Amino acid sequence: MLLALTGWLASCSHVATEEQVRSAELPPEGVPPQRVVIGVEQQKMVIFDWKKPKKMYPVSTSKFGLGNQPGSWNTPVGQMEVVKVIGKGLVPGSRLKARQPTGEVVPVNAPGRDAIVTRVLILKGAEKGNANTRQRFIYIHGTPAEDKLESPASWGCIRMASTDIIELCEWLRPGARVDVVPGRLPPPDDLPN
């Protein structure tokens, strides 16, 4: 990108304006700058910056399978959007209940603990089939049950290790696109439209 920008600037007979430099740094039309894709078969999440893979994380989706029915405890599939990030600044393992910190810190792999911890990404469905995602309280969130990552173990949400969701939330902004695909993670050129 820098070489293209440098070449573009060199070809100009005038000094580039700040607006011209900003527009040269924008992604191609229709490519979301931040994107999260979750491959349920592999129990992995890949984050993309302008269709370029940035990082992969282990996740855990629902132990009850995939679907969009209220009360099913299924992980919804399809396109969604991050609406809000909750918990910035909380220490790893900080328990959240009703999207509010409780003051309790749950240790990693604490026996019998199945809490929402560290950060919560509130999602809304962007398709007819998953439009109820927000009303179903389906989130991407931290889990103390890190020993269950890479296997379906959640009650519908997408779980991550506390250190991973902290890192994700440092990069991700509201408005980022999230795709949950039932199969394997697609290559970048085959991402859902």
Model-derived regions, located:
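Sec-dependent N-terminal signal peptides
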Residues: 1-6
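A structural motif detector for short, solvent-exposed N-terminal "entry" segments of globular domains
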Residues: 23-66
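Exported/periplasmic cell-wall-interacting domains
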Residues: 26, 31, 69-71, 90-193
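Soluble periplasmic/extracytoplasmic beta-strand elements of cell-envelope proteins
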Residues: 35-39, 44-46, 58-60, 81-83, ...
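A generic structural signal for short beta-strands and their flanking turns/coil linkers
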Residues: 55, 76-80, 117-119, 136
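Electropositive
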Residues: 58-86, 90
